[in-house]
Amino acid sequence: QAYSAMQNPVLKSSSTSGPVFAPRGDWLKAGELRRNPDLARTYRAIADQGRDAFYEGDIAREIARYSEENDGLITYEDLKRHEVEWQEPVAISYRGRTVYEAPPNSSGHVLLQELGIFEHFDPQEYGYMSSESIHLMVEAKKLAFADREAYLADPRYVDIPIEGMLDPAYLSERAQLIDVDNAAENVVEGNPWEYMSRRPDSRKKHREAGRLHKVGSDTTHFCVVDRWGNSVGELQSIQTAFGSCVIAGSTGILLNNRMTYWHLDPDHIDYLNPGQKVRHTMNPLMVFSAPVEQGGKLELVCGTPGADTQVQTNMQIVTGIFDYGLNVSEAIDGPRWTHVQAGMGSAYPHKDIESLQIEDRVGEDVMSGLQKLGHPIQSTGAWGGAGSEGAIQVDIKNHTFFAASDPRREGDALVW
């Protein structure tokens, strides 16, 4: 489906990608087989020789060769230096449960901020997917995205006040900015440094009190839970569909185009720097009955592709289950909204136009109510919302699992 929709001319014209995706100079038709024997050889080499085959062996050399011959920036030394980082997750308490997210440079904290702000409102006062509840969640999202735009980058290069951003008092302060009767037009970041136990590290770039201080949608998600409660949530992405649309020489590997998330303004917190990791939107999510160190049990693991929409879709799943009593399938199938915040989109050129995109299954009264609150509404039809959520819910009391996959995109859910 995505393949036929893209029809990217680079994918077709490239001397390495064209023979795979458009053999004979034309796109494959339904029922025809796509063959990529180079990629099969790459997989076999990794299976036989391990990670060094990719990062230090012939595969790395071929990627570097192709990059150099085509004016790319990837070198053999870049690949050789790569190391996986094991990091502690970030977490907040939400209505008596503990929600864990990926730490910076992931946008996982954005979802936690959204939930922490929304927690200051009583969901039972507003119906599920009512204009009032959607309004409150959208306004919480705006505040969290404003903080992301101001503070999130690679923590090795930028000092991020992450503890302050997740501090309950700070989230309460942010929640008080929400007008229940009107959509905010100009949302700015707060100052979470006031809620930190330390001052910013002067050796790193950081933003404080509105000032920047300087030193001198090709994503896949899956989640798994075994009978003992061990769980994995994984997201992998080469950015937009088919990434750069270019295969690296004879490796069969499509190169990504994640660098479109960089900002080229030196005064932006996520400004392009050598060796720095670009911030990203992938945020695998787990919800436990209590903190893990206190014996908390897994209740939900979920995730979705969708760039800036990920933390918004995940918010709707978590609130649907734990605020409105939906099961995991009902929460995923429910009407979905996505807010686009002017000037705060992750992808270059970062010039998005403000809109609230929503599936019209919410009903005309909800759409009308949101417009009256000041939201610029765009209908996405009945099932045209963003994301492709996959989730597993665990019933701790009865020791049963429930899995669901998003009907909006290709996906599957299995329990046995």
Language-model features: locations:
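Short, well-ordered beta-strand elements
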Residues: R97-P104, L111-L115, P123, F222-V224, ...
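Short, well-structured alpha-helical segments that form the helix of a local strand-helix-strand
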Residues: Q1, R61-R65, Y128-F145, V328-T338
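Active-site rim segments in enzyme catalytic domains, especially the processed small/beta chain
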Residues: L73-T75, V225-L300, A307, V311, ...
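Short, small/polar residue-rich loop motifs at catalytic or cofactor-binding pockets
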Residues: W86, G216-T219, H280-M282
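Internal maturation/activation junctions in enzymes
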Residues: G25, H120-I238, S250-T251, R258, ...
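Alpha/propeptide regions of enzymes that mature by internal proteolysis
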Residues: L33, A47-A64, E68, A183-V188, ...
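Noncatalytic scaffold domains of N-terminal-nucleophile
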Residues: Q1-G50, F54-E56, A60-S106, L166, ...
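Extended C-terminal subregions enriched in glycine
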Residues: W228, Q276, N314-M315, D323-G384
